[in-house]
């Protein structure tokens, strides 16, 4: 069963982002609280879509709960291992990111099932593209995908099948959820949930991992330096435009390797940003991406930083 939503957009002159976080251990209650916060932070802007990520128990009705607060909004997301915020990691609660597109942008959301993740990735791309009849041959923009595990290389499998249809210009990050649920409307248990934005927004992806050097596993200090470099790379891609949103997505293996140094890693990444720039993230079983300077790999201890800013004037 497949589902996609292409909203009728109330466009604003610039990209607007509202973020809400709740530590309520009840995931549905946490989604409602976080959605309310995110909606209020958007002010008068009308959100086009929302990302919802939970930690701890899986939400019973993530989409329905969020829509009770924000109305008939398109939703993508999933249940992660932990949430990452300026207050430290959280093993329970919810994160909601609401986005109101700028003039000329279009967003599409799809939740897909299938016999395997390859089919789900192809179906998601077809559905999103079908809602963009005005699209260029290869749409340009940014996408966030959430996939349930389906084999040992789930992220690469999704990204390869998605890219076959979407083309090379849609920068895409895929979080593998470690057996937990992907959230979206349509399929009862979707294998994949994805939101994609076609727009000339400035965006950047920074990457680092924990691949051993000469057989030696990186130390926590090395991992912290790698994370700071990934953040600097992602910010540099914006070419001087201030980031509206910064997302750090960490693999569970990296979280284990860091141990108590996780707070140092977050501080190192945060140090590359203005204190008022919103920065959030989550932990998945694995994470991979393709985009400018980044290719999907199965390297251990991956960390991906994504930045999103206004389009050039």
Regions found by a protein language model. Name each.
Residues 2-313:
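Hydrophobic alpha/beta core scaffold segments
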């Amino acid at each position: 069963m497949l589902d996609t939503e292409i909203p009728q957009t109330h466009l604003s002159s610039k990209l607007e982002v509202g973020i809400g976080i709740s530590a309520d251990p009840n995931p549905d209650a946490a989604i409602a609280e976080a959605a309310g916060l995110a909606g209020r932070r958007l002010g008068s802007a009308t959100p086009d879509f929302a990302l919802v990520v939970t930690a701890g128990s899986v939400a019973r009705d993530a989409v329905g709960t969020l829509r009770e607060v924000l109305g008939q909004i398109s939703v993508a997301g999933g249940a992660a291992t932990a949430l990452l915020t300026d207050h430290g990691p959280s093993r329970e609660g919810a994160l909601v990111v609401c986005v109101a597109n700028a003039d000329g942008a279009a967003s599409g959301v799809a939740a897909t099932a299938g016999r395997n993740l390859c089919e789900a990735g192809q179906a998601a791309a077809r559905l999103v593209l079908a809602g963009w009849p005005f699209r260029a041959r290869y749409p340009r923009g940014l996408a966030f995908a959430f996939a349930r595990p389906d084999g040992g290389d789930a992220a690469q499998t999704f990204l390869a099948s998605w890219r076959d249809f979407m083309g090379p210009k849609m920068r895409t990050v895929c979080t593998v959820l470690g057996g937990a649920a992907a959230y979206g409307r349509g399929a009862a248990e979707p294998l994949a949930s994805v939101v994609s934005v076609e727009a000339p927004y400035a965006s950047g992806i920074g990457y680092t991992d924990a691949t051993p050097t000469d057989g030696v596993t990186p130390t926590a200090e090395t991992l912290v330096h790698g994370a700071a470099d990934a953040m600097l790379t992602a910010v540099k891609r914006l070419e001087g435009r201030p980031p509206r949103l910064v997302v750090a997505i960490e693999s569970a293996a990296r979280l284990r390797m860091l141990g108590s140094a996780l707070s140092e890693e977050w501080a190192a990444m945060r140090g590359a940003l203005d204190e008022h720039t919103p920065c959030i993230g989550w932990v998945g079983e694995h994470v991979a991406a393709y985009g400018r300077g980044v290719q999907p790999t199965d390297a251990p201890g991956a960390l991906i930083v994504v930045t999103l800013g206004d389009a050039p004037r």
